[in-house]
Amino acid sequence: MADKTPPERRLKHQAIFVCDMQDKFAPAIWQFDKVVLTAQKVLRAAKILNIPVYVTTQNAARLGGTVAALEPLLAVTGATTIDKTRFSMWVPEMEQHFASTAGSAAAVVSKFPEQLQVVIVGIESHICVTQTALDLLAAGHDVFVLADGVSSCNEQEVPLALARLRAEGATVTSSESWLYETMGDAAIAEFREIAKLVKETSADTKVALSALLSKM
């Protein structure tokens, strides 16, 4: 008799981190507009898959907020935004969103499991993205860095950063590969919506891959 159990996603406990995608950085970052394209796709997927989104800004009072192109998607995903001065996104305010809290009688279980699969897009690959990934790995989480969703001021920094992160234990992959790995099964409820998203963004995906991975 066929198993009628509904299929589960391959990656079940995820969070998406969007790192420092601010207006002031846009002119200086190599292929920044292509990073935006990938971030938009990832955020649309987060809405469909109900994956929580966390955003940081670096010293927003001086460097401004997140780029306008991402704001509507951040709003519909209910993203949490944290301002910081550290380079890593894994600041105490961020950790508090993932930590269990202790009550007077017993521990109150967090809505998040102890081990997450954290997906990172943003800038700069060799500074804030790298330090965020290293801190998350040290905290026991799995890290997915989307190679078509990160960049730096100097393009030569990007492959160096990604090579280091692979060596440290992060998974360096593409946004489309991550999407299909997240689902794991074409029978999950959200498959049709994600397949439609992939089709709608296929031209942007090709542009981003061609631009950001051309030297890798």
Where are these regions (language model features)?
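Active-site acidic carboxylates
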Residues: 1-88, 92, 103-108, 134, ...
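Structural motif
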Residues: 15, 116-119
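Short acidic-hydrophobic, aromatic-tinged amphipathic segments that line or gate anion-handling sites
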Residues: 81-84, 171-177
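Short gly/pro/ser/thr-enriched loop/turn and capping motifs at secondary-structure boundaries
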Residues: 88-89, 127, 150-155, 179-181
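Glycine-rich phosphate-binding loop signature in dinucleotide/nucleotide-binding domains
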Residues: 100-116
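A short glycine-rich beta-strand->turn/loop micro-motif centered on a GG-aromatic cluster
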Residues: 119-122, 140-155
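Short glycine/serine/threonine-rich phosphate/pyrophosphate-binding segments
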Residues: 125-132
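Gly/Ala-rich phosphate-binding loop of Rossmann-like dinucleotide-binding domains
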Residues: 137
